[in-house]
């Protein structure tokens, strides 16, 4: 339910704004999002500041499969990044702000505005409206239709994923059950062998 609610609210969520302090040994700050196979992803970035202001801001965009979509070194201002996801996966937008000790001070930082759009949100609806000569109400209905299709596809993906996990769980349970039966058989056989061995040993010593 929460996932569905986020999908419905996604078109109304404003861009993410934050400050990233410059450090001599910076750690990457990453924002993670998820995308389905074949979906268009558009990332818009805007920063304040200027080159040589003591901040060396770097950007890395990559997914969990190891694909890298963009790498920017010492950038400032507006940047637009677009790519089509080769598979259903998560991707990270990572920032790294290094302090230039020769030009900056310990309070150096960059204000960053980040907006990530995917699927129907990432499409150029103005161009589509002009090309297909859609009226405003038709354009809104088209947006709703595509968003609904995306929600249905996402729900189907979650359903299929749940089925795969259930099958894996059932297979694991079956292997554990078979292993438990095998252990019981081995322990029973070992116990019987020990009893027989002790019986023969005591007989040989004329104890019994």
Swiss-Prot record:
Major subcellular site: endoplasmic reticulum
PROSITE patterns according to UniProt: GOLD
Keywords, ordered alphabetically: Endoplasmic reticulum, ER-Golgi transport, Golgi apparatus, Membrane, Protein transport, Signal, Transmembrane, Transmembrane helix, Transport
GO-annotated biological processes: endoplasmic reticulum to Golgi vesicle-mediated transport; protein transport
Signal peptide: 1-15
Pfam assignment, any one: EMP24_GP25L
Residue span, GOLD domain: 28-118
Lumenal membrane side: 16-177
Protein family: Belongs to the EMP24/GP25L family.
Protein name, as recorded: Endoplasmic reticulum vesicle protein 25
Species in which this protein is naturally found: Candida glabrata (strain ATCC 2001 / BCRC 20586 / JCM 3761 / NBRC 0622 / NRRL Y-65 / CBS 138) (Yeast)
Encoding gene, per UniProt annotation: ERV25
């Amino acid at each position: 339910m929460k996932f569905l609610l986020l999908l419905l609210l996604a078109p109304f969520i404003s861009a993410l704004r934050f400050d990233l302090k410059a450090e001599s040994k910076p750690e990457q700050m990453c924002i993670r999002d998820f995308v389905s196979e074949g979906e268009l992803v558009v990332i818009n970035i805007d920063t304040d500041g200027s080159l040589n202001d003591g901040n060396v801001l770097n950007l890395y965009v990559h997914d969990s499969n190891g694909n890298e979509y963009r790498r920017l070194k010492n950038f400032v201002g507006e940047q637009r990044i677009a790519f089509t996801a080769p598979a259903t996966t998560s991707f990270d937008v990572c920032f790294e702000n290094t302090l230039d000790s020769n030009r900056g001070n310990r309070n150096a930082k960059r204000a960053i505005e980040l907006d990530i759009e995917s699927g129907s949100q990432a499409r150029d609806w103005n161009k589509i409206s002009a090309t297909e000569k859609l009226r405003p109400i038709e354009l809104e209905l088209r947006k709703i239709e595509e968003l609904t299709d995306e929600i249905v596809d996402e729900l189907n993906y979650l359903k299929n994923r749940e089925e795969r996990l259930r099958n894996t769980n059932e297979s694991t349970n079956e292997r554990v059950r078979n292993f438990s039966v095998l252990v019981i058989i081995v322990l029973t056989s070992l116990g019987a062998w020990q009893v027989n061995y002790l019986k023969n040993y005591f007989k040989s010593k004329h104890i019994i």
